[in-house]
Amino acid sequence: MSYSYAEKKRIRKEFGVLPHILDVPYLLSIQTESYKKFLTADAAKGRLHSGLEIVLKQSFPVESKNGQYELHYVDYQIGEPTFDETECQVRGATYDAPLNVKLRLVVYNKDALPNEKIVEDIREEYVYMGDIPLMTTNGTFIINGTERVVVSQLHRSPGVFFSKDDSEEGAFSARIIPYRGSWLDFEFDSKGIIWARIDRKRKFCATVILKALGYTQEQILENFSETKTITFNSKGFALRLDNLSNMKGELLKFDIVDAQDNVIVKKNKKLTSRDVKKIKDAGVDSVAIDFDLVSTLRVAKDIVNEATGEVIAYANDDVTESLLESCVEVGMLELEVIDFITTERGRYISDTLKYDLTRNTDEALVEIYKVLRPGDPPAAASVKALFEGLFFIESRYSLSDIGRMKLNARLGSDKVSKDIYTLENSDIVGVIEELINIRDGKGKVDDIDHLGNRRVRSVGEMVENQFRIGLYRVEKGIRESMSLVHKDKLMPKDIVNSKPITAAIKEFFTSGALSQFMDQDNPLSEVTHKRRISALGPGGLSRDRAGFEVRDVHATHYGRLCPIETPEGPNIGLINSLASYARVNDYGFLEAPYRKVVDGKVTDEIEYLSAIDEDNYVIAQASTKLDENNHFVEDLIQCRSGGEAIFTESSRVQYMDVSAKQMVSAAAALIPFLEHDDANRVLMGANMQRQAVPTLKSEKPLVGTGMEKIVARDSGNCIIARNAGEVAEVDSNRIVIKVDTEKSQTSNLVDIYSLTKFKRSNKNTCINQRPIVNVGDKVEAGDILADGFATDFGELSLGHNLMVAFMPWNGYNFEDSILLSERIVKDDKYTSIHIEEFTCVARDTKLGPEEITADIPNVSESSLAKLDESGIVHIGANVEAGDILVAKITPKAEQQLTPEERLLRAIFNEKASNVADSSLRMPSGTSGTVINVQVFENDKGGKSKRALKIEKELIDKARKDFDEEFAVIESVVKSSIEQEVVGAKIQKAKGLKKGAILTKEFLATLPFSKWLEISFEDEKLEEKVQNAREYYEEAKIAIDAKFEAKKKSITQSNELSPGVLKTVKVFVAIKKRIQPGDKMAGRHGNKGVVSRVLPVEDMPYMEDGTPVDVCLNPLGIPSRMNIGQILEAHLGLASYGLGKKIEKTLEKTRKAAELRKTLEEVYNSVGDKKVNLEALNDEEILTLCDNLKGGVPIATPVFDGAKEEDIKSLLKIGGFATNGQMKLFDGRTGKPFDRHVTVGYMYMLKLDHLVDDKMHARSTGSYSLVTQQPLGGKAQFGGQRFGEMEVWALQAYGAAYTLREMLTVKSDDIAGRSKMYKNIVDGKLTMNVDVPESFNVLRNEVRALGIDMDFDYSSEEE
């Protein structure tokens, strides 16, 4: 087994028995693939069936009303973005690119005859059609400077669905849902009548739709019912027994007798195959029935007197005595009737036709028009156009390829081609037929929560739909423009207005429910946000009306949606996460991978199955035992089939799971020993990992699952090598790799990677990248070069490993509280950096422009000490609460001065200050260091000194960066040429003869530019040098061009909002140490609040004097049933012991051979998966050992983790008791505790619920307008609510004075609180109480009821 660069530095020992069959697919592919499909920028691959191309093709050509102009679509191009991703974030711009569409305007001769079209002119040009937001490499969008994610939506798939309303007997319904257009419903009522609805409007008879489609009453009955023939004569009535086989399973309503009056089959019996044979053998072809039965029948076809042409009865008329008499009169002794006798099937349509008052197609169309447009007069043309537009015109109704596929599959017919996306007559007839079958018990209703009936709509598809909406508006505009514009040489640009497209797309990205502000607490929260699948949003469910069924875990979720990770609260079950191996197919259905089983042998061939396909197979679990030939060991195997868990013979198995973790999401797969935790707690654990704050120093988990590196790699926060090569240069800002051209398919000789330094994330955490490679290291493509935030050697590291003791300690861990050691604070283990952005905007006001300046009236020098001459804070300044960050003045209206004030001003020579101080100050409760300042100005007033200074710094930095980049390229080209040419024969060189040998010394005397002028006799060598020469020249041109582009973007004017003159952004880094009140958690849903930070010397300690870091309450485990944390602690302790073992070996010797023995014991004595230490050289073994001193990292994959025996064996090797318990001593007294305590290493996270962000205090502040009570909450700088129950408490103690001030001066007694403030200033310690404002509100409310109520002050005066 080969190891990557980062893995060699620290190999994770892996438990788990199952073989590795399939790599976890790229975690962000659901986002990137979907949007790539939408843009389909690569025309060579054929932009045909999706995205922009199809929308544009469907919308064009557009024809003018008079037919003179036609606008055709030809092609489109997506331009280059103005700014790159980082620049857009800095400037608050959107990362997008212009869409230019090539349109062809065809002009026809207006004098030509109406039926012929003579082309007069064709004009073609590219037309700007708005800006399309581009997706960043990590699957996000930058909209107005902020990173956003478009969450995929799980919605009901287009197609037909049959369901049953349990509240009513026989209330079955069918609903045809298109991708775009009107919904069509058919439903049974309790009487067996079939009703139809369009778009959930008023219901009408289903037969109205059939008549509107052109069917006659007779044709409708023929389609939906069986017919029987009745013969009648003087003896009575007889029913012909045709198609006996069709009657099988039906209940007989009469006895069947033979010629001798023997009963062959009795009445009220279900007919069987044996009965049918008996009847046929007896030669019975008809059976006598009485008139009572005949009178329940109806005529199947119109009965016409052939002699006169008179209609005796219409189809569906009841059979009556008079009708029979009329038939006898004209000599008809046979009557074709609808078969209600042997089946109920025909009665539903027949009864519906009885209710249906329309007689033909025209009346049916009018009836539908009245339902959809009540009040509108129905005109013949508009009536037909409305009905056709509903279901039969592709621009207004589309089932889409998914809907057509689902509809054909559900009706079990392929009569309609896959390419027809509108409804056909046969579809509607088929749906009604199937509905009748279901009512008759011959079909099944659909399970709406089955993932075969729900599909995922990803970002590309949503943007495509928005684009279609915008384009539809543009199309209407084009038609209007064609008829209004009178221009000799009309061009496409003149008639196309692209604003509706821009508006539709902008609206979707800025205010759409599924376009969300990216969760960026840590890399995991980014990844899970992008993999989220929501059932909410437009066209989805609403959380108020979603029931239990839709939220529940369904059998089809297996391997597709995670059954664990979902929010707690009102959205539970509506927002899900994609399972780790799941993918979305071309139709939008979720698929899971399986290994194919052929003739009882499990192959490594992988097949992806959708939920519909999976129902038909028997699938074995990933943990099923196999022999060395991949055959099943056991005869009876636990499998899944049709959504049920079954035991079955191994010969029946068709597929097998790929991995044990395929049913859970990426976040749940990060929890070790997940299988030993209760599902509710795992849900909390998976959700809380997303809230972990990245700390100053990242530390890998000692006990992981092996999923850490996958999440870190795919999150895009680490820097990954594009090509193999050697590290040429490293510093904190840049890594330079000299590319190995033999291994890499690239013409580049150098790869340069720029690192992100101290960037603010969406959640104000700090994004920072650190290189992990050294100069001279050899790296392969795909190796990690630099860690991002919350990663350690390319592994996700959300917290720290702490030594935990499960024991109570003086009540400080009561109710999930956490007792911490001071060592954690000293070592800055949970210290995190938060970057806050403060913005100051100078606007143009009515009274004049606001000004950012250091010259502010009535502000002391000390307050301005941290500002520069422009009035903006210096970078590096330490700022406290209340400090000025940006000094700004706002003009205020002139005020009239009293004579006294004018006199004073004259005496003290003070100028009238007509400006107010509106500076940006540091908010209360915060302090930190200014790390960056950005100034944005419009060009009108010229740039300020600070703006010019920042601009110059950026240009100088860019110049330096590009110069250094070029120097690196030059040195690489130089060394590669030198290696090739030294010792070669010269063709031509200044200072040397032809045929001379080139030496290193001679090259050293020449500048590099002259090297490139030397030519050689060897043609191959000459070609190589020529290639290097060309690469060097191209690189020089490219770097100059890049610098010019960068310079242009730095100096480019900023587009500020209207009325804004200048915007200043100040970034302050705030360091937050862990303190009491902060929330911490493990990975098993074991959360708590820090109650106390205890000095190290008071913490319980082990026999060797090592103090523990954390004391957790043992009572938090049994009831919560998250035993995984105990196993993690045991395995963590073993890992720590193994690290100590390696450290002791290192202290004795640094010989690789000895170290290999220790490593062999540590890695390969326990567990099935061995580590190949032979793949590492001696130097790498030493580095590995140095990195393992703190503990040997262990991976225990979910559902395939370490067993109890493995943990005991490792504890033994690590030198600990196999029960994981030990004697602890009290740090305060030095005495041992009574019982042994479970001690181990657990990975603990600090969550983004910090006490600093919640604690807040107020003396005076703002008040509510109506009640005049202080506002509530930190954001409003509100007060502490003293509620009803608190008042009762004071009443119970009789604390009258305290109560009075709580309800008056401290709350809403306006006069009293003003007086109180004055009294405090004057040194008077008295309190004047007035009527609280809430009483006045009450009085006014009572007055509103017409009762005059006032307060009686007389008793007070007396």
Curated annotation (Swiss-Prot):
<dbReference type="InterPro" id="IPR007645">
    <property type="entry name" value="RNA_pol_Rpb2_3"/>
</dbReference>
<keyword id="KW-0808">Transferase</keyword>
<dbReference type="GO" id="GO:0000428">
    <property type="term" value="C:DNA-directed RNA polymerase complex"/>
</dbReference>
<dbReference type="InterPro" id="IPR007120">
    <property type="entry name" value="DNA-dir_RNAP_su2_dom"/>
</dbReference>
<dbReference type="InterPro" id="IPR007642">
    <property type="entry name" value="RNA_pol_Rpb2_2"/>
</dbReference>
<dbReference type="GO" id="GO:0032549">
    <property type="term" value="F:ribonucleoside binding"/>
</dbReference>
<dbReference type="Pfam" id="PF10385">
    <property type="entry name" value="RNA_pol_Rpb2_45"/>
</dbReference>
<keyword id="KW-0804">Transcription</keyword>
<keyword id="KW-0548">Nucleotidyltransferase</keyword>
<dbReference type="InterPro" id="IPR010243">
    <property type="entry name" value="RNA_pol_bsu_bac"/>
</dbReference>
<dbReference type="InterPro" id="IPR042107">
    <property type="entry name" value="DNA-dir_RNA_pol_bsu_ext_1_sf"/>
</dbReference>
<comment type="similarity">
    <text>Belongs to the RNA polymerase beta chain family.</text>
</comment>
<dbReference type="GO" id="GO:0006351">
    <property type="term" value="P:DNA-templated transcription"/>
</dbReference>
<dbReference type="InterPro" id="IPR014724">
    <property type="entry name" value="RNA_pol_RPB2_OB-fold"/>
</dbReference>
<dbReference type="InterPro" id="IPR019462">
    <property type="entry name" value="DNA-dir_RNA_pol_bsu_external_1"/>
</dbReference>
<comment type="subunit">
    <text>The RNAP catalytic core consists of 2 alpha, 1 beta, 1 beta' and 1 omega subunit. When a sigma factor is associated with the core the holoenzyme is formed, which can initiate transcription.</text>
</comment>
<dbReference type="Pfam" id="PF04565">
    <property type="entry name" value="RNA_pol_Rpb2_3"/>
</dbReference>
<protein>
    <recommendedName>
        <fullName>DNA-directed RNA polymerase subunit beta</fullName>
        <ecNumber>2.7.7.6</ecNumber>
    </recommendedName>
</protein>
<dbReference type="InterPro" id="IPR007644">
    <property type="entry name" value="RNA_pol_bsu_protrusion"/>
</dbReference>
<dbReference type="InterPro" id="IPR007641">
    <property type="entry name" value="RNA_pol_Rpb2_7"/>
</dbReference>
<keyword id="KW-0240">DNA-directed RNA polymerase</keyword>
<dbReference type="InterPro" id="IPR037033">
    <property type="entry name" value="DNA-dir_RNAP_su2_hyb_sf"/>
</dbReference>
<dbReference type="InterPro" id="IPR037034">
    <property type="entry name" value="RNA_pol_Rpb2_2_sf"/>
</dbReference>
<dbReference type="GO" id="GO:0003899">
    <property type="term" value="F:DNA-directed RNA polymerase activity"/>
</dbReference>
<dbReference type="GO" id="GO:0003677">
    <property type="term" value="F:DNA binding"/>
</dbReference>
<dbReference type="Pfam" id="PF04561">
    <property type="entry name" value="RNA_pol_Rpb2_2"/>
</dbReference>
<dbReference type="InterPro" id="IPR007121">
    <property type="entry name" value="RNA_pol_bsu_CS"/>
</dbReference>
<dbReference type="Pfam" id="PF04563">
    <property type="entry name" value="RNA_pol_Rpb2_1"/>
</dbReference>
<dbReference type="Pfam" id="PF04560">
    <property type="entry name" value="RNA_pol_Rpb2_7"/>
</dbReference>
<dbReference type="Pfam" id="PF00562">
    <property type="entry name" value="RNA_pol_Rpb2_6"/>
</dbReference>
<dbReference type="InterPro" id="IPR015712">
    <property type="entry name" value="DNA-dir_RNA_pol_su2"/>
</dbReference>
<comment type="function">
    <text>DNA-dependent RNA polymerase catalyzes the transcription of DNA into RNA using the four ribonucleoside triphosphates as substrates.</text>
</comment>
